[in-house]
Amino acid sequence: MFQVQKELASHEAVVVALFEEEKTSSFVQELDKAFEGQLQVLLEEKELSTKKKAISKVHSLGKTDVKRYYFVGLGKKESYTTETLRSALGKTFKTLQAAKVQDAAILLDSFVTEKLDAIDVAHIAAEVQGLGTYELQTYKSDKKDRVELEKFTAITAEDAQEIEAALTVGYVHGRATNSARTLVNMPPNVLTATKLAEYAVELAEKYDMDYKVLEKEEMEELGMGALLAVNQGSIEPPKMIALIYKGKEEWTDVIGFVGKGITYDTGGYSLKPREGMVGMKGDMGGAAAVLGAMEIIGELRPEQNVIAVIPSTDNVVSGTAFKPDDVITSMSGKTIEVLNTDAEGRLALADGITYAKKLGANYLIDVATLTGGVIVALGNHTTGAMTNNEELFEQVLEASMETDESIWQLPIFDRDKERVRNSKFADLNNSPGREGHAVMAGTFIGEFAEDTPWVHLDIAGTSESSGAHDLGPAGATGAMVRTLATLVERFGEE
């Protein structure tokens, strides 16, 4: 699909950057020779806009071998960022998709500045080509035909091999993020814990990873009472899923991802209202993020050791379901007083984290659609983070900045630990109250990470979008897939 060339050839569409300070850049001047100065007139008349994310279409009318040019406004160079580029190109690829373009090219060097080199631009272009044109997978009987972009050419004076590599990496990042989106969007009667495990096994086998899928009996033997408690009310069997990627000869410096895999959450006996229950098929967004990251890792083969653990079940009501006031024993041996059955994700993660440590994880990053509290605190565009290790958090933060997936650190104070340890009947309680809800949830999970370096990512606000945006339609976003993969790719770098 991707090609790299030094000269412009025949294409259906060519994408060109426009900055406010350089309305007559060398790229525009060169094109304007064929247009006999008409582009300059369009710029002066503001028919070609340099405003951020403005897209201006110009037909060549036979003056060149290119059918249409799409000029992409990027605003001022001083405010030009990777986020600006991602949004602008995402919108551009949506426009090309709507026009049913099958052969497009990008004047890569027109997007290059002192801040962003050609490799950065190539990576982002290939990544957002997939993200921006992602289409919601539905179960409607009337299927519409979709025209795909079949050929995408980067026009650049830079080294072709390096640009091709960047295009490939970007494409893999975008495709894997879309894989995660599709998982999150699937209905709960289709994506059960069993189906999620089957998907994970297929992924592991495709990329030659080791894997384990623990059944209920094995979980009982290992004492995974927290996950099993959440599963008590369900007719669907629980799964503890583990994918193991060995990127080094020695099993050291193992990064452990733990993704919440609650395939549907009614709240259990602490029942959600109807409006709060609709959409809870997406409560396995953390699991999807982890699997998406493992798809990237399997494709690109970084020299790191990685474990992905997914505790999976649904949380439903029945005569056998767990109840408020129950006391359960986790895999770690710590006992938990259940004060809220709708705080089930942290219970599943507790056993997931302990199992990841048992498999050899030296660093832990858990990802979960955990609390509504984080949405109140940070909104729908920022993931909440907590940690017991600032050095590890800094690496996660740097990865998130590279991928433009915003995160913000929330605190853990000793008084927060005291609140989750406040129980007359057990070592911990799973829900100290609504105050500081997001912090309480993360603090609870940290009790199981113990001294292992750990970062908690609450994606409740970022996992899904209520409306269409530059990088995709309404629905699942694939939050943290690219950040997790980038963390692994960059791990340990100075």
Curated annotation (Swiss-Prot):
Main location group: cytoplasm
Active-site residues, Swiss-Prot/TrEMBL: 272, 346
Entry binding sites for Mn(2+) 1: 265, 342, 344
EC identifiers of the protein: 3.4.11.1, 3.4.11.10
A GO BP entry: proteolysis
GO CC annotations, alphabetized: cytoplasm
Catalysed transformations (reactions): Release of an N-terminal amino acid, Xaa-|-Yaa-, in which Xaa is preferably Leu, but may be other amino acids including Pro although not Arg or Lys, and Yaa may be Pro. Amino acid amides and methyl esters are also readily hydrolyzed, but rates on arylamides are exceedingly low; Release of an N-terminal amino acid, preferentially leucine, but not glutamic or aspartic acids
Keywords recorded for this protein, A-Z: Aminopeptidase, Cytoplasm, Hydrolase, Manganese, Metal-binding, Protease
The keyword Transmembrane appears for this protein: no
Binding site for Mn(2+) 2: 260, 265, 283, 344
InterPro entries per UniProt: Leucine_aapep/pepB (IPR011356), Macro_dom-like (IPR043472), Peptidase_M17_C (IPR000819), Peptidase_M17_leu_NH2_pept (IPR023042), Peptidase_M17_N (IPR008283)
Single annotated GO MF: manganese ion binding
Family statement: Belongs to the peptidase M17 family.
Protein name, UniProt field: Probable cytosol aminopeptidase
Originating gene: pepA
